[in-house]
């Protein structure tokens, strides 16, 4: 992208707002990462766009249970990111609690890095698919239809009380651990889509709001001037895997690129969606 003459690529920059007539505010952090360097710290961009693509991703939802604010309780994706990107372990013995498949990747990742994962507590009566089988093959205990009744500990996690997902929350057993990775699923980041008038629709399958493709933000002539791509579009998967999907990301990105090119009066080049392997352990 940096080598293309018709592309302006800016890292460390976010879309702060999308307004009427394709008016976009961009907020660039120029020197926040090197405070002593000369020049401006921040820069505000004012952009007029013929079409806008929001590829803002998704945010992981937490789960509600007693003690979910005790230090050592974190989102499953955050624990995985610390381990993979920075080599930082949040705990030596992590219990994973989830209602979707994606958190299984965290358990598998931690186990492969030599850390202990005593149990995965899945709120669903069945789920996990091939990821659950991979976790079991690594010696991880998988409990379906289970949840956390409470986290044991004060200033840090020392264990969890396990309960049935359906019931009164009575503790069935306690598991010693020093970290909890929780995942309540994923929700598209729809702030910019909604900011400029785009409507949302409820998705019963994934229990989240997502952009309504039939009611996008529209310009003064009634034309759609914003499209969403990837997880931001709410298109997560076409398979039995209940989580984030690279295939769907590529597919919706291609569709959004075509929409942008057509909006500018150009003819899009036909490209095939790359073949990807999901569930990279």
Locate predicted features.
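Residues forming the flavin
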Residues: 1-281
